[in-house]
Amino acid sequence: MDNTFGKDVKIYKDAFIRASKIKDHAVIGDDCFITDSTIGEYSTIERRGMIFNSTIENYSYTGYNTVVKYASIGKFCSISWNVSIGGANHDVHHLTTHPFPFISKYGFANENTSYESFNDILKIGNDVWIGSNVCILRGVTIGNGAVIGAGAVVTHDVGPYEIWAGVPAKKIGKRFDDKIIEHLFKCSNRGGVVRPAYRIFKRKPVYVQRKCNP
């Protein structure tokens, strides 16, 4: 499969891109490695980012040294540096956690067989903020508007607009009360950010709530 590039895409030195779709106005930093993935409009992959078999939607960005594998990431996500999203699983119920019985290159198996290391779905919603040095395991879903504190290891689903931190990560709060969250969902269901109204996102939630009423 060939690459597809939109208009005004910026690709910096020594970036490697294979079988991927890079949409309009996206930015790919130095020494990035992107394969079998889609990078949305106005999205940025900072230097030394590695994206495998994933979709990153419009207006999202990843910091340097961040790795994303077999994941779906929504719009307007802010992902910091040194983040690991969707690393391979190792089955702790086998006699060994090493994949040598499944992969021929180690000299034991005659042929490669499925290890199912990426089968569990990993999905990150819209407007999610992920701090530096976070690790998000496979099988996790992170809801819209959630915040993950720096250094967290996320092993369970995170609800919309929840704040999680720690090792393992635990819920420590919510960004807004339930009424405001309900209004935010109504806004998003009407089509997301309308460009002429983008300034309301600089305001406090009570202002957003008033603007989003039918």
Give each language-model segment a name.
Residues 2, 13-138:
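Flexible, glycine/small-residue-enriched loop-and-beta-strand segment within the central core
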